[in-house]
Amino acid sequence: MTIKDFILKAKGFDVHEAINNSVRNNEQQLLSMNRDEQLFERGIDSNNRELPQYRPATIVAKMAKNQRFDHTTLKDTGEFHSNFKIITRPTEIEFTANSTPRDGRDLTIHLQARYGRDIFGLTEENKEKLRDMVRNEIIEDI
């Protein structure tokens, strides 16, 4: 690539578009950081706070199903975890989940009300990993 080509490419470079493309390219890894690493493995929200413990009845039910109960994972049937998604906007990304309302309640709304909106998103440690991913992809692009 000539210097002239590089300058022309740099002039047309949209940093927000590049970030969003990188997020989309790494979506499954980012979703795994949120739902698997933070929630399931560690029982923490995006602010690195431990989620409130399960109620005793939930612990008994999880034990009966041979599921993890030492901390809150927000994973019972797997429906909630399987519906995680990322919405990209020009200057932000949003982690969320779409759940199908059952028995008159929306699971995502119910879990957010119980555990807070911060169940979605990345910890500072994982945000740093995201920044590294994005930086590396942008450098490759340029």
For the regions a protein language model found, what residue spans apply to each?
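Short, Lys/Arg-rich flexible segments
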Residues: 1-142
